UniProtKB/Swiss-Prot annotation:
Modification Phosphoserine, positions: 221
Annotated region described as Disordered, given as residue ranges: 31-271, 318-340
CDD domains xref list: PDZ6_PDZD2-PDZ3_hPro-IL-16-like (cd06762), PDZ7_PDZD2-PDZ4_hPro-IL-16-like (cd06763)
Organism of derivation: Pan troglodytes
Chain intervals for the UniProt region annotation (Interaction with PPP1R12A, PPP1R12B and PPP1R12C): 405-501
Domain PDZ: 411-496, 533-618
InterPro entries on file: IL-16, IL-16-like, PDZ, PDZ_sf
Summary of the function given for this chain in its UniProt record: Interleukin-16 stimulates a migratory response in CD4+ lymphocytes, monocytes, and eosinophils. Primes CD4+ T-cells for IL-2 and IL-15 responsiveness. Also induces T-lymphocyte expression of interleukin 2 receptor. Ligand for CD4. Pro-interleukin-16 is involved in cell cycle progression in T-cells. Appears to be involved in transcriptional regulation of SKP2 and is probably part of a transcriptional repression complex on the core promoter of the SKP2 gene. May act as a scaffold for GABPB1 (the DNA-binding subunit the GABP transcription factor complex) and HDAC3 thus maintaining transcriptional repression and blocking cell cycle progression in resting T-cells.
Compositional bias of kind Low complexity: 128-144
Assembly mode: Homotetramer. Pro-interleukin-16 interacts (via PDZ 2 domain) with PPP1R12A, PPP1R12B and PPP1R12C. Pro-interleukin-16 interacts with GRIN2A. Pro-interleukin-16 interacts with GABPB1. Pro-interleukin-16 interacts (via PDZ 3 domain) with HDAC3.
Name of the protein in question: Pro-interleukin-16
GO cellular component: cytoplasm; extracellular space; nucleus
Biological process, per Gene Ontology: chemotaxis; cytokine-mediated signaling pathway; induction of positive chemotaxis; positive regulation of inflammatory response
Biased composition (Polar residues): 195-208, 322-340
Amino acid sequence: MDYSFDTTAEDPWVRISDCIKNLFSPIMSESHGHMPLQPNASLNEEDGTQGHPDGTPPKLDTANGTPKVYKSADSSTVKKGPPVAPKPAWFRQSLKGLRNRASDPRGLPDPALSTQPAPASREHLGSHIRASSSSSSIRQRISSFETFGSSQLPDKGAQRLSLQPSSGEAAKPLGKHEEGRFSGLLGRGAAPTLVPQQPEQVLSSGSPAASEARDPGVSESPPPGRQPNQKTLPPGPDPLLRLLSTQTEESQGPVLKMPSQRARSFPLTRSQSCETKLLDEKTSKLYSISSQVSSAVMKSLLCLPSSISCAQTPCIPKEGASPTSSSNEDSAANGSAETSALDTGFSLNLSELREYTEGLTEAKEDDDGDHSSLQSGQSVISLLSSEELKKLIEEVKVLDEATLKQLDSIHVTILHKEEGAGLGFSLAGGADLENKVITVHRVFPNGLASQEGTIQKGNEVLSINGKSLKGTTHNDALAILRQAREPRQAVIVTRKLTPEAMPDLNSSTDSAASASAASDVSVESTAEATVCTVTLEKMSAGLGFSLEGGKGSLHGDKPLTINRIFKGAASEQSETVQPGDEILQLAGTAMQGLTRFEAWNIIKALPDGPVTIVIRRKSLQSKETTAAGDS
């Protein structure tokens, strides 16, 4: 399409009007006038060069890198050139900036412009010049930004510093102004460079290279990646480094002292935490000694094998336990669990233990004391370690006479039993009830506590297995009592209350004691249960009942009991088993310590036919007490 037009016959619709020119180029020139259509004159005004009327091809200017197009002057008389959009004012300013940059020795000569061919039109020329000027300025900004970032990233500083001199565009602009700014940034970035080194120094503090990491001047051959870091560090001792070294030394101190502190406070940690809550000094001393003895004896019993613990205890007969002493010696020799269950244990009060400890300190024996009490004191002392015994003696020495008189009423009872067996008594009272003191509500006949004979109804329970009951709620006390079923030994510290305090105790806590003790009867009344053997018919559907409890159940380790009897089953018609019956044996297989899934697999593996089951059923008296407690 030909954009040329004749001046003699000019069509108003073909002619480019002023409004159209202003529409396509809002900023035409500084005077907002028309661009003359003589290309030679326009080039002479903008570029300051002379035209070539001989029609030579366009040449490239090496000073500013802009090609100049020259046309012959003969064609200007007849035809005018095509309309070319004039260049705005900012374009001429960019050309002037390129000229100034070319004359400046610190400028960036762009070798890419000298090798490119000349574009075909002015539009391509302008876009290329704008791209070259913007790219050169972007390179300068990138290079300056990299130098700024290298001072804050010391780990990557060596890589970036080695890459920058390879490019000619980034190496030259670091003149007076840029180098000054870069050195200033490095000076200000000297302090932040210490921050990334903190985890390295903490990790290497235990190694021999820790001193080299703290002092950069000591290391003779540092790694190449850390050389920029050491250059930015100040030569003198930095306060941040000194603070860091002191922090690492302080962090090492408690780590080295932890085992000794643990060893000193381990045996009596639980009792000491309970003693901080006590208000009365005399009572706190009593609780302190009782808790120390209880926790120390319990820990020693758990550390000893069962045969050794059974062999040490029979030398302390106690009233009703004297006929069983010979059988206890035989059980210790034979190692049978059935005969060792007859050994109920022994008890002694703290006054006897105090006399024995005083005898140890004074290197003499008390001949006036009972022989059985001396044997019981010796048996307890033999269970204690030297550190625990020394601390116990120090506790006893500082007691006054009034407190020493109260030691006669405090007894330490050690019971030997089977795993899972109850202690033979129930508890009453608690911090959440009217009676704040935890007492023995009931001693079950034929139980372990009844056979031993020391624990009586109304005695205050100070601790069980080293766990103090001072200030505990009723449910917490019952939980401690249930936890005592698992070990083969139990250490109970009780105190016999004075007769003056007994009426007040009974009058204030009859209702609370009956309700609280009834909730524990279902767990502790093993002596009142009857054991019977029943025979059931095993069908394809099973024995006709479901199980609950077992080891690892939702409520803890419970015995396997009958949960529900199915309708229409033979067990429902015969009424031989009832819900709540504990299953002891099933077809000659003991069910204690099994999970419900294991017991159910045993039932499914049985052949069809009659099956003998040994169950334990609670007596009527126990059920009535439980019902009264529920109501």
